[in-house]
Amino acid sequence: MITFPHRHLLGIKGLTEQDITLLLDRADEAVKISRQREKKTSSLRGLTQINLFFEASTRTQSSFELAGKRLGADVMNMSVGNSSVKKGETLIDTAMTLNAMHPDVLVVRHSSAGAASLLAQKVSCSVVNAGDGQHEHPTQALLDALTIRRAKGKLSRIIVAICGDVLHSRVARSNILLLNQMGARVRVVAPATLLPAGIAEMGAEVYHSMAEGLKDADVVMMLRLQRERMAGSFVPSVREYFHYYGLDAEKLKAAKDDALVMHPGPMNRGVEIASEIADGPQSVIEQQVEMGVAVRMAVMETLLLSQNQGPRV
């Protein structure tokens, strides 16, 4: 019996330490399934999952699709480029049309913050936020946490340095919320132009120097420089950005010798991270991809099979 008090996964905000631990523990079990020769189960047989992606995302959409299929669900990927959205249909109209088909879960990625929450108010099925604007990306934070926990054995009392384009990063926001909830010490390292207002109030220590921000860090999480979201000149040049904030062997020396190197992908090699580091022995970037499928399996199972009879919001 699964007991989970939420009908949707719209963000890390609102999840308790117990909620997060339950999802991570179930994801650990999903890792075992994914490593078996026979990877498919029947736990979600007869249930329908629709992936509705308004932003291109090869790895996240593929991960959600694989997660659903490994659990035995019927999975439909809706291509927005070929849909009625291109003909002027609104987000709500599209959601209501899909809702009329009686899916069990709707996985949504959208460029507008709050899009997933809006849909959750309109549809009768569960909604999973696969990224909404610069707001949140909860499954990414969960897979990052799972990667760290499996490597370090814990999340509490570790130092995690999140470096780069924090301003435009929903990944950073979700990770800060989750890591604080689980008792980690979180730092953000970035130029002032790439930090959002109020970042310290979210529970992150702010640094503008990689040498200081990475000192004794257990985990170094690099963020992609999101040039497609930038309307102004946030950095003088890519070359200068890498000089000061790109992770190379010299900068990594400030962290602990066994520090993990992470990146949510896709990477800009030579911009936020050097290839020698991305492909080096401390990198767990490939493990993050593997954990992504496991976490999304855990989320789908937990939301759809929860036997909790209390209020589910």
From Swiss-Prot:
L-aspartate binds at K87, R170, R224. Pathway: Pyrimidine metabolism; UMP biosynthesis via de novo pathway; (S)-dihydroorotate from bicarbonate: step 2/3. PROSITE patterns: CARBAMOYLTRANSFERASE. Its EC number is 2.1.3.2. GO terms for molecular function: amino acid binding; aspartate carbamoyltransferase activity. Carbamoyl phosphate binds at R59, T60, R109, H137, Q140, G265, P266. Pfam families: OTCace (PF00185), OTCace_N (PF02729). The keyword NADP does not apply. Heterododecamer (2C3:3R2) of six catalytic PyrB chains organized as two trimers (C3), and six regulatory PyrI chains organized as three dimers (R2). This is Aspartate carbamoyltransferase catalytic subunit. It comes from Sinorhizobium medicae (strain WSM419) (Ensifer medicae).
